[in-house]
């Protein structure tokens, strides 16, 4: 389970969900664990004491002495390598030739160990991207199940991959397929994962405070592809297409018409957008001449015919961005040979995930959407463009150092007004100053709902899509969503509508 390391002494950094899972996993497989957290009494400390009673816990600022006697560092995804104390420990580990793994690396090595011990060889699908990861992961898991396979869905989506694997091992129910949602944080310390198929949905500015630069952020995303992985790529995102394989065999998706075999896209016919598959139409073409060794001339393009799969409007999840998520999930499942008919039925049945452009109420001919999970600019751009109607947007919070200027064009095109909340409201206001849209600031989310509803007209939507993290005003994005739901319910009650 630990490669060449036999029962190593492991330093686990961070005691969040992943840190606790790594400590439990290491102890289960004979390793001694030292667990360190910058908090003196993290919330998971009682669980660590209960499940790993022999673990050594050290709370407080990280110190170089944590590395004494350690053969492996297992680092939690929330800890940035740019943090001075974390960086010092990682430098110390490198100087001592101590490997640094994250939870997904431990998971990948666990699968390799199970293959050697039991012949267990599941298919693995992996999903990353700035936005849409959770929806695509949950949808891919539902499609796998609809196709008659057992499935384990884990990773960034929760539960942790190691906890889910432990549960399956103990129950004797190891799944046919693993579907993993992977964040850039998790991928940063992943080295040997070789998924059967993987996708990068999109790459837009996010987590620059953690990675330091867009180049570093994108590079972390690219670690999702192993040597044998089928790459499922958003062909309309140049940063994603930079990871196209040199030998071909990639599968692409997008909201345009596909032009290469196996690609997915949209065909608009009579005002109806259809999800279509490009199939090779080479029946009448002459057999290509044998290519000489070293010939780098690009192969002639293969003509395609477009096969209609289903109207995009038949999806229960709203917006063009969700159509692309659906195409990515479909492409991943097709890459491991699952039957198309079952997959298409699964696409029609999937109802979506909470807090992701979720319709929570409709009254007075106005719809209210909760996109509290939209914690970056790219997510809000996708939500605005995907609803295809006039929107009063509620945005703001902790901007994590993002550039808000990409909001200006979609706000000008789709928004009737923008109500701003939170710490970075002034920065968003400055970015939208020339959009020609009314900009209003509110002290609380409850007040923002009132301001937004007062400006919405019949047929409009009020959209909470903050483009920011929530921690300046709320415990987390779920708490922000809860406050939004309660404020919308109170507004409805004031207007004589019970939700």
UniProtKB/Swiss-Prot annotation:
Main location per the UniProt record: cytoplasm
Does Cell division appear among the keywords? yes
Location in or out of the cell: Cytoplasm
Tell me which UniProt keywords the record has, alphabetically. Answer: ATP-binding, Cell cycle, Cell division, Cell shape, Cell wall biogenesis/degradation, Cytoplasm, Ligase, Nucleotide-binding, Peptidoglycan synthesis
Q: Which reaction does it catalyse?
A: UDP-N-acetyl-alpha-D-muramoyl-L-alanine + D-glutamate + ATP = UDP-N-acetyl-alpha-D-muramoyl-L-alanyl-D-glutamate + ADP + phosphate + H(+)
- Residues binding ATP: 129-135
**GO CC, one annotated term:** cytoplasm
Enumerate the InterPro entries for this protein. Answer: Mur-like_cat_sf (IPR036565), Mur_ligase_C (IPR004101), Mur_ligase_C_dom_sf (IPR036615), Mur_ligase_cen (IPR013221), MurD (IPR005762)
At the top of the EC hierarchy, this enzyme's class is ligase
UniProt pathway: Cell wall biogenesis; peptidoglycan biosynthesis
Tell me which Pfam families the record gives: Mur_ligase_C, Mur_ligase_M, MurD-like_N
Highest taxon listed in the record's lineage: Bacteria
Q: What Enzyme Commission number does this protein have? A: 6.3.2.9
- GO BP terms in the entry: cell division; cell wall organization; peptidoglycan biosynthetic process; regulation of cell shape
Molecular function in Gene Ontology: ATP binding; UDP-N-acetylmuramoylalanine-D-glutamate ligase activity
* Family statement: Belongs to the MurCDEF family.
What does this protein do, in the record's words?
Cell wall formation. Catalyzes the addition of glutamate to the nucleotide precursor UDP-N-acetylmuramoyl-L-alanine (UMA).
Identification of the protein by name: UDP-N-acetylmuramoylalanine--D-glutamate ligase
Q: Which organism is it from?
A: Ralstonia nicotianae (strain ATCC BAA-1114 / GMI1000)
The primary gene name is: murD
